[in-house]
Every structure is written in structure tokens, then in C-alpha cells.
């Protein structure tokens, strides 16, 4: 039987940086885990630095980001638990499909090719960037961030979260996610029937405007060859760090630790 994973890799989402995991990482470290929260390539700087010079986002796409994380995971001595939020949850699915990881958790995960749902709230949340097809990157203003990330909170509370965590996002990543179903060779795609991948937990938040529960539930149902679970937390928005986050964090870790295994398809490149 495989040893229980001792490492957790946290992958942030669009319009965020590893800072968004600061409380989760601290909690998991207090439980004895080695916690890595690497940035998307080029986004290693602090939130303030990226906001001052977002040109570091130019050229980022899904394949570049996933390859980056696969390299990090491949340098570990054993497969970790991989957790991703939003696009990070989409990347988690791709990494598991490649044979990386002992278990995966997607929090409000971005959908992959084959999931046809495109709720109007998702379109509205993404429109500040999608509406400008020639933009290489773009951020969310106070009202846009409130709608997308913190709609269960007051505007004032949302502004505090935005000031601490929000950065512009690379437009190409968003386009590859939203339009995956229209791309023949979409980077945001997996083999739903891959039986060698590790188990995965799909977590949805009932009030999420960016990735509402239904698309996540439909996505989880497409995985028929591996253990998966869908869990919905009521009254929560897209941002995973609002009050009560500890319940979500503990549920995610408990599930991953209980279901973790060494994927049969792990290759030397991912070990």
C-alpha cells in the first residue's frame, strides 16, 4: 500500500496569486504537511509588484502553466495531494490526467472540454477580459471583483479582499478555458475514462458566480473510471478565503488523505 502523502501542492486561480492560499497553507503546515504554493510562471512576485507591472503575464497560456507545475511535482520524492482553485482546479484535473498526484481537489474548478455548461453569471464575470479580444491581460475593478469573487459580502469587505489578493489575469488562459469546447486540440481537456489517474474531489460553492455548482456537478459526473466526489458548500462565493474557510479546508484535506493513492500511470517524468 502506498504511503500517505506528506506534501500538498496548492495552485491558485486567475486574478489571484499564491497569497490567496496564505491561511490554507498555514493551517496545513500546522498539521505537519509540507505545503508548496508555487506561482504561475512569471508571477512569483508579490501582488503589489504584479499590479505595478503586469507585463509579466504576457505569453502565459494553459500548457505553459501546467507544464510548470508538472515540473515542480516531478521533482518531489513522492506524489503529493494537489489542490487547485478556479483555473487551478482545471489545471489539477489535467495534472492528474498526466499521472501526477496521489489525490486531487478542485475548489470551484474551471471546467474542461466536454462540459457544455456556460452560465450567464460566468460570462458576466469573465466579460471584463473577454470583451477586449486584443488585450493580453486585464484585471477586475471593485464592482466587477465584488460580483465575481465576493458577492456574499459587502462592497467594503470585498474591497479589502481585492486590495490584498487581486492581480490582472492573462487573457489567453481565460480564452482557452471559456472556448475549450470550440477548439479541436484544447489545452483544457482530459480523458474522462483514464482509469490510471488519482481520485478527485470536486467542491462547489452555492453562491459562486464564476463557476456555479451545476457545471461542476456535471463535470464530476463525467469521470466514471476513478473515485470522485462532488461536495457543495452553501452560502459561499467564489473566493475560498471568506469566513468559515476552515471547514472547507479540513474537508478537502480529510477527503484527499483518505482517498490518496499512487496512480498506476505515474511515469519517471512525474516522480
Model-derived features: positions:
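Conserved alpha/beta-hydrolase
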Residues: 29-51
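Gly/Ala-rich beta-loop-alpha elbow adjacent to hydrolase catalytic centers
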Residues: 83-88, 92
Amino acid at each position: 500500500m502506498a504511503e500517505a502523502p506528506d506534501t500538498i501542492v496548492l495552485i491558485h486561480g486567475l486574478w489571484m496569486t499564491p497569497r490567496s492560499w496564505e491561511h490554507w497553507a498555514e493551517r496545513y503546515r500546522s498539521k505537519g504537511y509540507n505545503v508548496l504554493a508555487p506561482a504561475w510562471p512569471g508571477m512569483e512576485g508579490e501582488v503589489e509588484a504584479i499590479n505595478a507591472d503586469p507585463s509579466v503575464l504576457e505569453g502565459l497560456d494553459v500548457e505553459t502553466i501546467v507544464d510548470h507545475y508538472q515540473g515542480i511535482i516531478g521533482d518531489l520524492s513522492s506524489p503529493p495531494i494537489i489542490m487547485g482553485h478556479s483555473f487551478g482546479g482545471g489545471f489539477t484535473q489535467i495534472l492528474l490526467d498526466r499521472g501526477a498526484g496521489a489525490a486531487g481537489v478542485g475548489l470551484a474548478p474551471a471546467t474542461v472540454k466536454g462540459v457544455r455548461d456556460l452560465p450567464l453569471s460566468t460570462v458576466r464575470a469573465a466579460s471584463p477580459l473577454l470583451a477586449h479580444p486584443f488585450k493580453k491581460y486585464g484585471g477586475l475593478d471593485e464592482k466587477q471583483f465584488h460580483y465575481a469573487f465576493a458577492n456574499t459580502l459587502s462592497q467594503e469587505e470585498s474591497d479589502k479582499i481585492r486590495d490584498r489578493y487581486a492581480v490582472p489575469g492573462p487573457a489567453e488562459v481565460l480564452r482557452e478555458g471559456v472556448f475549450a469546447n470550440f477548439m479541436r486540440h484544447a489545452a483544457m481537456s482530459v480523458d474522462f475514462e483514464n482509469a490510471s489517474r488519482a481520485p478527485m474531489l470536486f467542491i462547489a460553492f452555492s453562491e459562486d458566480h464564476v463557476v456555479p455548482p451545476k457545471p461542476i456537478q456535471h463535470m464530476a459526473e463525467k469521470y466514471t473510471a476513478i473515485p470522485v466526489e462532488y461536495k457543495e458548500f452553501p452560502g459561499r462565493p467564489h473566493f475560498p478565503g471568506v469566513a468559515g474557510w476552515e471547514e472547507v479546508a479540513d474537508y478537502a484535506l480529510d477527503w484527499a488523505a483518505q482517498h490518496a493513492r499512487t496512480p498506476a500511470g505515474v511515469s519517471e517524468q512525474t516522480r
